[in-house]
Every structure is written in structure tokens, then in C-alpha cells.
Swiss-Prot record:
Component of the molecular motor that translocates viral genomic DNA in empty capsid during DNA packaging. Forms a tripartite terminase complex together with TRM1 and TRM2 in the host cytoplasm. Once the complex reaches the host nucleus, it interacts with the capsid portal vertex. This portal forms a ring in which genomic DNA is translocated into the capsid. TRM3 carries an RNase H-like nuclease activity that plays an important role for the cleavage of concatemeric viral DNA into unit length genomes. The lineage of its organism: Viruses, Duplodnaviria, Heunggongvirae, Peploviricota, Herviviricetes. A motif (Walker B motif) lies at residues 305-310. GO terms for cellular component: host cell nucleus. This is Tripartite terminase subunit 3.
């Protein structure tokens, strides 16, 4: 029989072999440590009591005699032999009496058992251990592990968001029966009690996207997540796909290094064929690392978590393999990438901004509200609202911005800031709700009971076009009035010249005057007319159009007619309006008013050039729908346009925008009698 010190040495030797990367296949179970032997088969024997042992044990007669004396031959006498008890023990047992359990006590125990069922669940214990170890790592508790782990770590909000996405989905799929109770525990642990149930449900989605600026620790944070999941989640399968092989190999080595130096004493860590596995003696937890050039390696896998790093630069052919895991209800796919807006091919994930469910998470130094103003200011390096802050290890100033743009124009916004230019450009300026409300809700301006609430002044804006090309441009005319804090459209005209042989000024003036006279005839409460004729194209023609309109209107009505006046090159006030930088301000003001429901149309809207073929409001809505913002280059002022390729021009919407813009009292001083 082996002595005690020999058994201890064998046990120690066996533990060393287990920790090695490759240990002999002849290692037997630790259940028979006293008889473990690594000798050749010719020297081995199989004994009923000792199991697999060295044949030299047959020479120890006391050992053989002991085994023979206590050998179990399954004889009936052994099972029927009477057990002997001490008399005092028998008398003490006879005096024991048991009281029946009351119903209240039984119900209390059942309730307590139901409440503690979650905490006894093995899957919950795995999640709880993961949370405990991760918190310990954040607090710097692993002092003997990887360099830097001894320091306390403060997570960025997107990193905490990523961690919540991972653990929430695993909790729901691992413990579906107790999912609600697990989520309540996680909500308390992450201190996100302020979130609504709708926001909580986002964490349980099968796919999510994170767009984060460069150098913010995206890949760095993935490494501890994979490591601690392998340690605590028994049987989990993780996939990691990178855009380059050297990136996936780097993450593989870092995960292996962390696993071996953090918890290799308790578990066997193995690295084979780009797969890191940890043996939990009941099941293995594995993590496979691949590049987008070898996505065939992830085919046929049964991942619970699939991390796609730098997803914007993944080969499009590889996405077919990755997206195939969406059909698996136990797989969570997380796309992580840096924000890059240089070309459409490297920012295709921004299309998810218009997805019916929230799955796009964008981190930027500049919020979307101030992005365009930030772009127009050449020296700005921080958002005006200061809602988003940069980490301490990121240094941004005007010199960095200038230097980056000197190497490559626009590099600061595209590569460093991580702007959301593509998202903002694709964002619709006019909401669907406001367009539907504008189309359906129209006021009756002939209702005599409402005369006292309508404004008494009619504003008309005329944008003349001296061409017969219907695809290029036409004359837009809009008549707008006030109703309390809202604006009413009384008339719309979109006029095109038939040919260049006729007098363009006369034709345009007659069209506008005809509409104005009709509006004034239908609405007798209007007692003042203010007209602005755009003179950017031809100032002389604009003055002549103004004179012709005044002559036609005053010959039919006795209303007071005022024109917007602008000084010409000789500093003489002339009846025309010059559109300049205030166009962008007017458009932004119109968008705000339209989306807020302050722009309405009259049921008795007057139109002689549109009504014959279209509903004037639907015709106007087509141009409103095309309204978009165009940013030419960084440092330049953005402009707005409603022109689209192969679509109608934007003359009518510009006339409506400027008419509502000139309704403000600040412009009243510019209207005078001509």
C-alpha cells in the first residue's frame, strides 16, 4: 500500500500535469489518487477493490488480506445482519417525538422556497459570479494578474451599455423561466432603475450596433468580457470576427494570456486552432477567433454571442455568413465599429438609424443638434452644449483639427471626431406626422364667426423666373396670412412662361395679381397687402413687376398696398427683395414651424395654375418632402434645397417659406408704399 507522503507527491505531480498545455493521455481520474500509476501496461493490474494499480501491490500481503476480508460478495446474510445499538442511544431515540408542521409554517416555507429558487439556480449563480468577478476587476482586485488590472477602472457609458447588452441577453436565454426576476436583479446591479420597460427591452434584442470614435477602447473592452464569460458561463460559445487576421490574433493572444494568468489554477485553459477553451469538468466554454477572410470557420457553429469588430470594414461577402446567425434565437450579434463617413461603403451601418426598432448606438463628441453648426465653425473642437465629453487621454484642439485637415480635407470630422454626417444627411427634415396633419387639417377662412381671429394683413412673396424650361425653374407665388400664432396659406401659384416672345414681366404680374384679387374678394376682413418681389435675378424686372401688380390690385380694390424695399447700388430704396444669407434661417424657421403644426392651409385656397391638374396642397407637399440640407465642405455654410434629380423644382416651397418668414414683425419696417 502507498504511504501517505508518496500519495501526496503523486497528487502534486498529477496537479502539475493537469495545468500543462499538453499532458499525457494516460492520466487517470483523481477519484483513485492513491493507486494512480503511469507505468507501462505490462506492469498494470486490475483489482476489484483497488481498481487500476501497479502489479507490485500483489506482493503486499496485508493489503491483499484486508481487501479479501472486506470484499463484498453480495451475500444475503450481509444485508440481513442485525445492527447493534447502545442501550442509552436506543432509549434516547425512543423518547424523541415529532410535532406536525402547521399550515401557516408550511406556506411560509413554500413561499421562502419560491423566493430563494432563483438564487439556487446554477445558471443564476454563474451570472452572479460573472458580475462579482467583473466588479472586482473594475475595482482593481486582480493585483497578481495582467499589468494594469491592479488599478481601478472607470467605464465609459458605451462600454457599460455594451456589457448590459451582453449579460441581459445571456440571462434571458439561459434562464427563460426566471427571466423577469433575473432582469430585476440585473437592473438593480447596474443601477438603471430609471429606464423604462421599452428601453429595457432594447437590451434583449438579437442584434445591436455600436459606432464609437477611434481610440476609445472598443477592442480593449471586448477582451475582459470574453475572458470572464469563459470562466463563469459553463458551456457558452463565443465568436469573434475582425476585419484583419492580425486583429483577431491579437485578441486571441490577449484573452489566452488573461485566462492563464488569472484563473488557470482552477481551470484547464487550452488554445487549439484559434479556439480557446476552458474545461469546467462538465462542459467546455469556447471562444473562436476568425477574420472576415476566413468566415467559413464560423459556419456550423452554435454561438451564444457573436462579436463583429470594425464591422464597417468587414467584407460584404462575409456578412452573409454573419447575418445567418440572426435565425438562431439564442445568438446575440453585436456589431462594433469606428464611425467613418468618408464613403458610403464604410458607413453602411448608419442606415439602421431609420430602423423600426432601436438598435443603433452612436457615440460622438458632437450631438446631432449642433453637428452642422460645428462643421461650419472652422476652429470648434467641442459641442456647444457640452453634453458629450471626451476622455482625459484624448487631446483635441484647433491645431489638431487644422493639422488633420491639412493631410486630408475633412479628415478631422470623418476620422477623429466620429461625426454622424451620413446619419444627419439621411435624416428627414419634415416629419410624416406634420405632413399628414397639414394635408388633412385645413381651416375654413370663409367662416364669419372666425373673422375676428384672422390676421388683417396678407403677405405675398413672388419668386420670378424668366425662362420657359419647366424642368429648370418657374415662378412661385405664395399668399400667407396669420391666425393667432399660426400661419394660413391663402393662395399658391406655380407659373411657367409659354414662350419667350411674350412680355415675361407682364405675364408674371398678371398671374400674381389675379390670385391676389381673388383672395381679397373671398376674404373681406383683409385690409392690408404686403408684397415682396425677389430681385436676385433681375432687379429692373422685379421693379416693373411690382408696379404692374400695384396697378392691377388698386384698380380693383381700395386696399392699402405695401412693397418690401431694398436699397439699390445708388442707395435708393426700390420695391424688390434680395435673398441672401437669411435664406437658411428662413428655411430652418419654416421647418420648426411646420413640424410644430403652425403652418396650415385654407380650405378655400386660390390657385389658377395648379388646381387644374393637382390639389395645390398635395403639389406643395411633394416639394416639402424633397427638402434637404446640403453641406458642401467643412467650414462652409450649409444650404437647403428642395430640388431632386428627375423631380419638380422648388420654386413654390421657397415662396411659401419666404412669405412666412416675412410675416414676422421684425420685417414690418421694410414694407413701404411704393
Amino acid at each position: 500500500m502507498l504511504r501517505g507522503d508518496s500519495a501526496a507527491k503523486i497528487q502534486e505531480r498529477y496537479a502539475e500535469l493537469q495545468k500543462r498545455k499538453s499532458h499525457p493521455t494516460s492520466c487517470i481520474s483523481t477519484a483513485f489518487t492513491n493507486v494512480a500509476t503511469l507505468c507501462r501496461k505490462r506492469y498494470q493490474m486490475m483489482h476489484p477493490e483497488l481498481g487500476l494499480a501497479h502489479s507490485c501491490n500483489e506482493a503486499f500481503l496485508p493489503l491483499m488480506a484486508f481487501c479479501g476480508r472486506h470484499r463484498d460478495y453480495n451475500s444475503p446474510e450481509e444485508s440481513q445482519r442485525e445492527l447493534l445499538f447502545h442501550e442509552r442511544l436506543k432509549s434516547a431515540l425512543d423518547k424523541l417525538t415529532f410535532r406536525p408542521c402547521s399550515e401557516e409554517q408550511r406556506a411560509s416555507y413554500q413561499k421562502l422556497d419560491a423566493l430563494t429558487e432563483l438564487y439556487r439556480d446554477p445558471q443564476f449563480q454563474q451570472i452572479n459570479n460573472f458580475m462579482t468577478d467583473f466588479k472586482k476587476w473594475l475595482d482593481g482586485g486582480f493585483s497578481t494578474a495582467v499589468e494594469g488590472d491592479a488599478k481601478a477602472i472607470r467605464l465609459e457609458p458605451f462600454q457599460k451599455n455594451l456589457l448590459i447588452h451582453v449579460i441581459f441577453f445571456i440571462a434571458v436565454t439561459k434562464i427563460p423561466v426566471l427571466a423577469n426576476r433575473v432582469l430585476q436583479y440585473l437592473i438593480h446591479a447596474f443601477q438603471i432603475d430609471f429606464l423604462s420597460q421599452t428601453s429595457i427591452d432594447i437590451f434583449k434584442q438579437k442584434a445591436t450596433v455600436f459606432l464609437v470614435p477611434r481610440r476609445h477602447g472598443k477592442t480593449w473592452f471586448i477582451i475582459p468580457i470574453i475572458s470572464f464569460l469563459l470562466k463563469h458561463m459553463i458551456g457558452i460559445s463565443i465568436g469573434y470576427v475582425a476585419h484583419q487576421k492580425h486583429v483577431s490574433q491579437f485578441v486571441l493572444k490577449e484573452v489566452e494570456f488573461r485566462c492563464r494568468h488569472t484563473f488557470a489554477r482552477d481551470y484547464v485553459v487550452e488554445n487549439k486552432d484559434n479556439v480557446i477553451s476552458i474545461d469546467h469538468r462538465g462542459a467546455k466554454s469556447t471562444a473562436l477567433f476568425a477574420s472576415c477572410y476566413n468566415t467559413n470557420s464560423i459556419r456550423g457553429q452554435n454561438f451564444h454571442l457573436l462579436l463583429v469588430d470594425e464591422a464597417h470594414f468587414i467584407k460584404k461577402e462575409a456578412f452573409n455568413t454573419i447575418l445567418g446567425f440572426l435565425a438562431q434565437n439564442t445568438t446575440k450579434i453585436i456589431f462594433i465599429s469606428s464611425t467613418n463617413t468618408t464613403s458610403d461603403s464604410t458607413c453602411f451601418l448608419t442606415r439602421l438609424n431609420n430602423a423600426p426598432f432601436d438598435m443603433l448606438n452612436v457615440v460622438s463628441y458632437v450631438c446631432e443638434e449642433h453637428l452642422h453648426s460645428f462643421t461650419e465653425k472652422g476652429d470648434a473642437t467641442a459641442c456647444p452644449c457640452y453634453r458629450l465629453h471626451k476622455p482625459t487621454f484624448i487631446s483635441l484642439n484647433s491645431q489638431v483639427r487644422k493639422t488633420a485637415n491639412m493631410f486630408m480635407p475633412g479628415a478631422f470630422m470623418d476620422e477623429i471626431i466620429g461625426g454622424t454626417n451620413k446619419i444627419s444627411q439621411n435624416t428627414v427634415l419634415i416629419t410624416d406626422q406634420s405632413r399628414e396633419e397639414f394635408d388633412i387639417l385645413r381651416y375654413s377662412t370663409l367662416n364669419t364667426n372666425a373673422y375676428d381671429y384672422f390676421g388683417k394683413t396678407l403677405y405675398v412673396y413672388l419668386d420670378p423666373a424668366f425662362t420657359t424650361n419647366r424642368k429648370a425653374s418657374g415662378t412661385g407665388v405664395a399668399a400667407v396670412g396669420a391666425y393667432r400664432h399660426q400661419f394660413l396659406i391663402y393662395g399658391l401659384e406655380h407659373f411657367f412662361l409659354r414662350d419667350l416672345s411674350e412680355s415675361s414681366e407682364v405675364a408674371i404680374a398678371e398671374c400674381a395679381a389675379h390670385m391676389i384679387i381673388s383672395v381679397l374678394s373671398l376674404h373681406p376682413y383683409l385690409d392690408e397687402l404686403r408684397i415682396a418681389v425677389e430681385g436676385n435675378t433681375n432687379q429692373a424686372a422685379a421693379v416693373r413687376i411690382a408696379c404692374l401688380i400695384r396697378q392691377s390690385v388698386q384698380s380693383s380694390t381700395l386696399i392699402r398696398v405695401l412693397f418690401y424695399h431694398t436699397p439699390d447700388q445708388n442707395h435708393i430704396e426700390q420695391p424688390f427683395y434680395l435673398m441672401g444669407r437669411d435664406k437658411a434661417l428662413a428655411v430652418e424657421q419654416f421647418i420648426s414651424r411646420f413640424n410644430s403644426g403652425y403652418i396650415k392651409a385654407s380650405q378655400e385656397l386660390v390657385s389658377y395654375t395648379i388646381k387644374l391638374s393637382h390639389d395645390p396642397i398635395e403639389y406643395l407637399l411633394e416639394q416639402i418632402q424633397n427638402l434637404h440640407r446640403v453641406t458642401l465642405a467643412e467650414g462652409t455654410t450649409a444650404r437647403y434645397s428642395a430640388k431632386r434629380q428627375n423631380r419638380i423644382s422648388d420654386d413654390l416651397i421657397i415662396a411659401v417659406i419666404m412669405a412666412t418668414y416675412l410675416c414676422d414683425d421684425i420685417h414690418a419696417i421694410r414694407f413701404r408704399v411704393s
